């Protein structure tokens, strides 16, 4: 059995925010991937906090979601 790794808080914020913004716009992971020029499996991995996302891909995802890239790193609002 593999060793469990503690998830990075920034990666978790990006995962949650991408999923929230995507759902709010009614996009599937496939649709967001197409808009961002990324594969749907990569979008899924981002939303599960399984990958470190490059700043270039944060920019691509933010542009596809029509948000400022910094919003993908913002803490969850109450």
Task: Please identify what each model-predicted range represents.
Residues 18, 32-33, 43-46, 72:
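Conserved hydrophobic/aromatic packing and binding residues within compact polymer-binding modules
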Residues 16-35, 60:
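Short basic helix-loop element that most often maps to the first helix and adjoining turn
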Residues 37-51:
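Recognition helix of helix-turn-helix/homeodomain-like DNA-binding domains
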Residues 1-3, 63, 73-78:
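Short, charged recognition helix plus adjacent turn
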Residues 20, 24, 64-67, 78:
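Conserved amphipathic alpha-helical interaction elements at protein-protein interfaces in regulatory
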Residues 54-71:
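DNA major-groove recognition helix of helix-turn-helix/homeodomain DNA-binding modules
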Residues 2-24:
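A short, Lys/Arg-rich alpha-helix, primarily the initiator
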């Amino acid at each position: 059995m593999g060793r469990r790794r503690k998830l990075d808080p920034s990666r978790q914020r990006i995962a949650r925010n991408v999923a929230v913004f995507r759902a709010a716009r009614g996009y599937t992971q496939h649709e967001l991937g197409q808009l961002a020029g990324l594969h749907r499996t990569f979008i899924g991995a981002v939303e599960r906090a399984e990958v470190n996302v490059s700043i270039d891909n944060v920019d691509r995802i933010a542009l596809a979601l029509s948000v400022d890239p910094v919003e993908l790193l913002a803490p969850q609002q109450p």
